[in-house]
Design a protein with these regions (language model features):
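Glycosyltransferase catalytic domains, chiefly GT-A lineage
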Residues: 2-350
């Protein structure tokens, strides 16, 4: 009996040791599934950071977005994910254009923008109705449309990119800054263009300083403005600072008090951004936003200067898919004809 009891004790001890050994292995060994993930993470393709680029595709000017996307895709090896934002009626068209052209290889998502979010926030202004189009305000709502990224690039559709978009994405944002823009006074080479077409590059050109609400901001009217057609944004800071809510507040105040209008320099989308981001933004390399190409059908930059530029922006009335306009050859290099034939370039011989 004593022998049997001793055998049972030994068996119990062995059982306890076996259980301990199993538990030790489970705690300290890397599971096979995790090992596989580790191998995958070490592969260059998986390590490559995704670069989200937001661009709008508006009815009547969808070819602009296509040319912009084409130029970005052709000039980089980076892992770019395009978020193409449009209204519900335009989404099928942009899908077909991309899927039936050489852009079918790009990574993209088509995102619907609901214009109802703007109800009661836009003051109607007949002087430049194109500036009141809903997609002009997509940049205000970036965190609501693009949710899985920490850093996002937003681009107007009337641009082409001649550099590697990775460089723009690598723009450093200072702590506490939700966005980076290009200052309107940052590049001496553009000053002559600005003077020749009578453009404003200060807050005076965008805000109505006759209004008390504007004067109460304490911003000097001679403060250099910035252009929000190219944005590198930090989504965490944007949400933390409630940037979208701040922009909406100034939109609603403009409806009530007419603090700015499209008769001023940048219309109704730039002005609230100038207010909200005053003194609280980082800067983009000036060569990554050469603008004003659309302000005059006659005034031109030098060919050498344009070749050095990383990004060209036809902000203004004179767009490169229309006539008259300048430097259209640089834009048309990246244009891909519409497979459906709906979008056509306007040229003097057409």
């Amino acid at each position: 009996m004593a022998l049997l009891k001793k055998i049972n004790q030994i068996l119990l001890l062995l059982l306890v040791l076996t259980v301990c050994a199993i538990l030790y292995n489970k705690v300290h060994q890397v599971p096979s599934a995790l090992k596989n993930e580790t191998v995958d993470l070490e592969s260059p393709e998986e390590m490559e950071e995704e670069i989200p680029v937001v661009i709008c595709a508006a009815a009547g000017r969808m070819g602009a977005a296509v040319a912009a996307i084409s130029s970005i895709y052709s000039n980089t090896e980076a892992n770019v994910l395009f978020y193409i934002v449009g209204l519900k009626t335009t989404l099928p068209h942009i899908h077909k254009w991309i899927e039936n052209s050489k852009l079918k290889e790009i990574k993209f998502q088509v995102v619907e923008f609901n214009p109802m979010v703007l109800k009661g926030k836009i003051r109607q202004d007949a002087s430049r109705p194109e500036l009141l189009q809903p997609l002009n305000f997509v940049r205000f709502y970036l965190p609501l449309l693009i949710q899985k990224h920490e850093k996002v690039i937003y681009l107007d559709d009337d641009i082409i990119v001649q550099g590697d978009i990775q460089e723009l994405y690598d723009t450093k944002l200072a702590p506490g800054h939700a966005a980076a823009f290009s200052d309107d006074c940052d590049l001496p080479s553009t000053h002559e263009i600005v003077r020749s077409v009578g453009m404003q590059n200060t807050y005076m050109g965008f805000l109505d300083y006759r209004k008390q609400a504007i004067r109460d901001l304490g911003i000097s009217p001679s403060t250099c403005s910035f252009n929000p057609g190219v944005i590198v944004a930090n989504m965490t800071e944007w949400k933390h600072q409630r940037i979208t809510k701040q922009l909406e507040k100034w939109m609603q105040r403009n409806v009530e008090e007419n603090l700015y209008s499209s008769t001023l320099g940048g219309g109704v989308a730039t002005s609230p951004m100038l207010i909200v981001f005053h003194g609280k933004y980082s800067t983009i390399n000036p060569m990554w936003h050469i603008r004003h190409l659309g302000w005059s059908p006659d005034t031109r930059y030098s060919e050498h200067f344009l070749q050095e530029a990383k990004l060209l922006h036809w902000n203004g009335r004179y767009k490169p898919w229309d006539y008259p306009s300048v430097h259209t050859d640089l834009w048309e290099n990246w244009f891909i004809p519409d497979p459906s034939g709906k979008f056509k370039l306007t040229r003097p011989d057409s």
